[in-house]
Amino acid sequence: MRLCTIALFAIHCLLFTSCTKEGDTIYKPTPGEEQLATTPLVTVIYGPNSLGDRSYCDLIYKGVEAAAKQYGVRTLQLAPESEEQGLAYLETMFRQMENATDTVRRLFVTPSPVYDAYIRKNNKRLEKNPYADLLYMETTTPLEGKGSTFYIDYYGAMYMGGCMAHYGVEDLLTVLLANPYTQTVREAGEGFIAGYNDSPHWNDRFPVQLHVRYLSDEPVGGFTMADTTAMRIYQEEKHYFSEEKDNNVTFVPICGGAMHAIFRALHTNSLLYDYDCYVGIDGDMCYDNESCLFSVVKHIDKVMVDYIGLWLKESMPKHQTLGLADGATGTIREGYQYAGANGYEYFKKRVDLDSLRQVAIRKEVERYEK
């Protein structure tokens, strides 16, 4: 309790000074480069243990810091260790904003569904402060009262990924979903599976079976995973068809930071099973050209830069849905080495990627017109 009290006191101080917090480390400005306490402040409160996932949340961090450099704002990025700690951070900030008497502009960003109920219950408290604003993502349901929301539709990009997964995959294609409840996860999985089912397989000599697997049955579960659990899942998928015989596996990990435990399991066994691979999700993972078939990406870092710019101009939209047509999502094919060809050349010979993108955009839009 004492540590929590100290942490909350530190946040209180940081809200009115010029520092940046990453995890448990507080960075003070370089001497001679101090920013005035009147400089606009962007505060991000991540979900529990989500920063450091090397994908979605790390891209948000990257985007916020890029915006700080571009626009000259201060940043405070908080990585709570538990939901309780994150809620305590939020309560401290809301209380301070209710009582603040200065005119410093502050934007609070919450990129986690863990805080959904709290945000929707308390966001109106910020209406007492004309200089405080809120950005909650990702959700399809706008906030009542103060605050903006946006949603990045992953269906189209994942549809492309499902079509492309036919090329270079043998035996088993395993889609790992964090849970069946989180909307972003569920719709991403639906898009990938639809794209896969709508496309012909590249070679009938090498049949492929699609296997969908959930990591958790909890509404916000499945985004973290122990290495031992990942190794068990890996071995189960390796023997999906037979206990006596190994099969090739391609993993599609739509499960946040848990994907990296799967990657470690895959790389640990790479000398034994050199045909196993994965599809990178959220971030560009094509640097791993031995194992990453291609990447389906969310450009959340660029979206954050744009939104902070809109906030500074006082033109942040109340709600917005972005997707493949907006450039908020896409696929990256560079890097993968297969039969002597890099990823882009390999897919270009087999798929009309421009036409596929247009089909995927249409599929994404059609879902909202029904």
Label for each model-derived stretch:
Residues V64, Y159-P207, V212, H319-K349:
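An alpha-beta-alpha
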Residues V44, A100-P113, L135-M137, F241-G256, ...:
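Periplasmic-binding protein-like
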Residues T184-D246:
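Extracellular/periplasmic Venus flytrap/periplasmic-binding protein
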